[in-house]
């Protein structure tokens, strides 16, 4: 599964090279409780060399269906110049999986949009169920000692000594045995 990604927009060819933009992202954090991933993203100028720059405007960045940046202002772009950057929060499906799409566009040497690009990535699934393991340590005719452990997604462990008629909860929010 992807932890980062990037794409280049289509190119505008000039005498001194192809001009385009590069969109890049990387995971900042994942939150199990909220079932969401936060990514860092950036949009940068690319394709020029040395002191060359180009005018570009009508920028737009869409991440997971949400417009995170939009500007009609025309600016001078050198290779590596950051047009915009930020974070975006992406909600996962109820089973913890998520594939998201990002797109970017701009007008390079044009007022109208003439360079576009997009990409799609599958994020690491966020666990939506806890894992508990157990084993019998010892037993007698009247007692049994059970070893158990849980992962960090488990808050409470419930057990029954009467075949499910009543249950006892143990706070295991620290995920320890």
Description of each model-found segment:
Residues 28-34, 135-142:
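Short, solvent-exposed loop/linker segments at the N-terminal edge
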């Amino acid at each position: 599964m992807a932890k980062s990604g990037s794409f280049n927009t289509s190119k505008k060819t000039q005498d001194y090279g192809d001009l385009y933009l590069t969109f890049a992202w990387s995971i900042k954090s994942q939150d199990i409780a909220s079932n969401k991933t936060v990514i860092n993203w950036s949009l940068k100028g690319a394709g020029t060399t040395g002191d060359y720059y180009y005018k570009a405007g009508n920028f737009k960045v869409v991440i997971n269906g949400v417009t995170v940046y939009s500007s009609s202002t025309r600016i001078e772009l050198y290779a590596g110049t950051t047009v915009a950057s930020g974070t975006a929060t992406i909600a996962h499906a109820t089973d913890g999986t998520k594939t998201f799409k990002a797109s970017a566009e701009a007008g390079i040497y044009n007022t109208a949009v003439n360079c576009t690009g997009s990409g799609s990535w599958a994020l690491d699934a966020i666990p939506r169920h806890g894992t508990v393991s157990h084993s019998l340590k010892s037993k007698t005719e009247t007692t049994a000692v059970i070893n158990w452990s849980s992962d960090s997604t488990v808050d409470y462990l419930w057990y029954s000594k009467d075949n499910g008629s009543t249950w006892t909860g143990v706070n295991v929010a620290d995920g320890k045995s």
